[in-house]
Amino acid sequence: MKIKIGNILKNVVILVIFSLFISKINSEVVKPNPAKPDELVIAFMSPYFDPEYTQYSGAAEYALSKFNETFKTKYSKTIKLHTFTDTNDVIDSLDLVTMPVNGIVGPAYSGSSSTACLVFGAFAVPSISFYATGASLSNSGSYPYFQRVMPDDRLQVQAILSLLKKNGWTRVSCIHTNEDYGNGGADQLVQQSNAQGITVNTNQAIDPVDNGIAPEQLYYDIVFDNLEAAKSRVIVLYALFPPDCLEIWKQAKARGFLGEGFTWIVTDGCAELTGGTDPDLLGVLATFPSYGLGTEAYTDFERTIVNDYNNNTGDAFYKGASFSYDATYAMLMGIEAVLAKGGDPWDGEQVRTELRNLKFNGITGTIAFDKNTGDRLYGEFALLNLINSTKGSFDPIGKINPDSGEITLKSDILYSGPTYKVPSDYQVVVFDRTLNIVLGVITGVCVLIVIGIGSVIALQWRKFRYSSPLFCMFIIIGALMGLASVFTLLPTPTTPLCSGFPWLLGLGYVIVFGTLFTKTWRTWRLFSNARKFKIIRITNKFIITLVGGFVLLESIFMIIWTAVDRPIPLAEPIFKAGEAQLQCTSDSEAWWYVFVFYKVFYILFGVFLAFKTRNVVDSLNESKPITLALYNLTFVMVVAIALGFILRDNPIAIIVIQTIAILLGFTVTVSVLFLPKVWMILSGQQHSMDSIGTSMDSMGRSNGNTTEAESTRGYTNKDYNNQSVGRSFSAHATGFKDVAPSNHPQLGIVYTGGDNFPRVGSSQTAASRSEAEINVSKDVLAKANKKNEEEFGEFFLKPSEDNILKKKKKKKNNNK
């Protein structure tokens, strides 16, 4: 009920006067004598205007009926129950203690108890509250004669936090009614949440509904404006009565805070709800101290209360009646224990002592009191769920042990939506469809560019002969796989898409850069051995095997990752402002770190190869495009990772950065490697990319006029530009008297030492000679060239026509 300023001032004045009176008599309070020596009096104190009052008082009368015969026959005592309303806590409590009474069941709620029990304690009258949960009542110095059968706010908050931790929620908002119960519960929630690493991002108070009159709209607007600013998704509602909750939910529906994505958890104040018939309330959760549901004793008790005692609520049963019964039953057991020991039932200290020694099974479970504070021990909470809007009340679906945090469910939890999927405690960001379409179109353009380059390579295969067109196509295929990974990022994440993204991106990366660097490694190895006049055999089959090894290693890692900790879509909190993005997540982030950082090996290896092949002849030299590709890849990784941390609060920026990083990483790499060559072919500037032959001189050279350093280094661009060396030479050319050529049956003529190769004039080339002079079948020569090219790729040195002619002449002379 709404607290009036006048009542507050009046109560303060009365308490001050009463405190002065208590201090003067030095705690020696003389209680009035009972009206009848053989009569015992139990007082029941609860707000008369509550709809639950008739059931609460009826439950107390029912408990009393269990003891009437025992007290009469065994102790010659009669016991009476006087009911009082707590319209004015101080005045009503003073009236009670001056009746006098042996004990008091009540007051019902924390606000009344916090005042009335001060008076009860001063007059040494034991009391048992059946619905007060305020944590301040546990202060034994202020409330020495206070007991309660309802678990306190501390335990209820522990039960709520157990539910939060079970669902992985770390952010919660709180709304509470502005009175003792709501204020105390909210304070406990904030204190215990902070201690357990759960953030209460906003704590909002609203006055309770007073006789059907709700607070002004302005105050509700303030509450929900703050909830919106905090991007609240999980909301704990500490409200005094169901009408308070219904009014707040009415406002929440108008502001869009009901439905899928929002979780409401109410406490015992609203767990008595009977009017939750709005379908939008489906999925609301409640915690309520266990009240015996499911036991035979509870079933009989509920039937009795509804049918036999004052009940103006139809067939509805209020859970608090179970606690009213247990509180009354405990008070009578304490008084009986005093009588059984020959004690004085009017001695409040004796009654309190026996109460705190009790342990029995009540309707709500095991009843026992803390010997120092009088708090209920063995408290257990029922987890309630609103799953039937026609019924309009909560149904129990499980139990929560607040001490251990254990939650036992007998059915799945229905969340708002309704859905059985656990919602996020963050505002889940849904990316703009228009943005996704734009990113998809850009990715599609990049895919077409790569496909176009690949088509030119396939159609102009021989013109890319010295670039190993087979491996060029491997690079194209890998780039397409990497670009395809973008299309797994744009739709709403699903488990197959989450698993497909690292597979496509990882294999695409390995194929592109594994092929590029392996092919370049072959160039380096061949030319580094050429300066030593060594012939090494590195076939295409060997290169394919190396690339396959890289792919196999990547596949093994991905298989283990997928089997052990497969990425799944979760709404992960990645933004400081209370937002989250539905993203693919594994239990351990170590998988992603390994996935990203071990690929740095490829970058380092690429830098090494680019440096080593910087002086190779132009037709085989890819150091410059590799350097550009590496620079681009390094830049993209560094900038993308840095921006990813800086812009974590911007969900749109995150997806854009991821997409652009992938597009630049693959599209630019393919472009710098192949686009210049493709352009030269398409524009007609160059008819063949292999017009400049690979001569035998590329294996190394030496003559008497060179220095030792020159004779041991590989063949360079400078050497190539200073000499025009054809594909073949004549053994009779001038200056070749010391040449010792080796006629390899597959490699052709290989220079193994001697003077420099001569500058072969145009008149000496094979193109200028007549077919009669060469006298070699072109078909035979073409077949030989094709066979060796397939095995040795661009490093095959064709058998020279001069050599073939020379061998034929030599054979003829030998025959003669």
UniProtKB/Swiss-Prot annotation:
Coiled-coil intervals in this record? none
Give any Pfam family that matches.
Answer: 7tm_3
Residues bearing carbohydrate: N68, N311, N388
Query: Which compartments is it annotated to reside in?
Result: Membrane
Residue span of region Disordered: 697-718
Picking any one GO molecular function of the record gives:
G protein-coupled GABA receptor activity
- Topology, Extracellular side: 28-436, 491-496, 563-590, 647-653
Q: How does it sit in the membrane?
A: Multi-pass membrane protein
User: What Gene3D superfamilies does the database record attribute to this sequence?
Assistant: 3.40.50.2300
Looking up SUPFAM superfamilies in the UniProt record yields: Periplasmic binding protein-like I
Task: Kindly report every residue range on the membrane side named Cytoplasmic.
Answer: 458-469, 518-541, 612-625, 675-816
Q: Which GO terms describe its biological process?
A: aggregation involved in sorocarp development; chemotaxis to cAMP; gamma-aminobutyric acid signaling pathway; regulation of sorocarp spore cell differentiation
TM stretches of this protein: 437-457, 470-490, 497-517, 542-562, 591-611, 626-646, 654-674
Q: Major place of localization? A: membrane
Q: Name one GO cellular component term.
A: G protein-coupled receptor heterodimeric complex
Q: Where is the signal peptide?
A: 1-27
Presence of keyword Repeat:
no
Gene deleted: what happens? Answer: Cells grow faster, reach higher densities, exhibit delayed aggregates formation upon starvation and altered chemotaxis toward cAMP. Cells do not produce SDF-2 in response to GABA.
Q: Which UniProt keywords apply?
A: Chemotaxis, G-protein coupled receptor, Glycoprotein, Membrane, Receptor, Signal, Transducer, Transmembrane, Transmembrane helix
Which conditions up-regulate this protein?
A: Down-regulated by growth on bacteria.
Explain the purpose of this protein.
May be involved in early development in cAMP sensing and subsequent chemotactic response. Probable receptor of GABA and glutamate, leading respectively to the induction or inhibition of SDF-2 formation.
Task: Name the family.
Answer: Belongs to the G-protein coupled receptor 3 family.
Q: What is this protein called?
A: Metabotropic glutamate receptor-like protein E
